[in-house]
Every structure is written in C-alpha cells, then in structure tokens.
Amino acid sequence: MTETITFTLVKSGIGSTDKIRATLTGLGLTKLNKTVTRKDTPEIRGMLNKVKHLVRIDEA
C-alpha cells in the first residue's frame, strides 16, 4: 500500500443518511469535486468503503 490516498467527492451527499453525511465531513469532503489527500490507514479505508458510491479514489 502507498503512504497516502487521494479521493474526490464526485456525487453529492444530498439525500443520503445522516451517517453518510457525517462520514463525508469526517473525511474532509464538504463540496463537490473537492480533492483530499490523507494517510492510508484502515480507518480511512473503512470510511471510504462506506461512501464508495459518492467518491473517486486515486491511490497515489
């Protein structure tokens, strides 16, 4: 695995449950097309798995 993981919000969280919206906020994804780079940890991977239908993941 790489040291960091980059992901982008490509679909809006509007209409999603409160848990999904809280996960997006926890990942730092507040606006559409916002790109965030984080350390690649199991916790971040789990959060991304929960919102995988809303984000694009670039492992670099």
Curated annotation (Swiss-Prot):
One GO term describing the cellular component: cytosolic large ribosomal subunit
CDD domains linked to this entry: Ribosomal_L30
InterPro entries, sorted: Ribo_uL30_ferredoxin-like_sf (IPR036919), Ribosomal_uL30_bac-type (IPR005996), Ribosomal_uL30_ferredoxin-like (IPR016082)
Segments traversing the membrane: none
GO biological process, one term: translation
Pfam families documented for this protein: Ribosomal_L30
NCBIfam families the UniProt entry points to: rpmD_bact
Family in the record: Belongs to the universal ribosomal protein uL30 family.
Protein name: Large ribosomal subunit protein uL30
Organism: Desulfotalea psychrophila (strain LSv54 / DSM 12343)
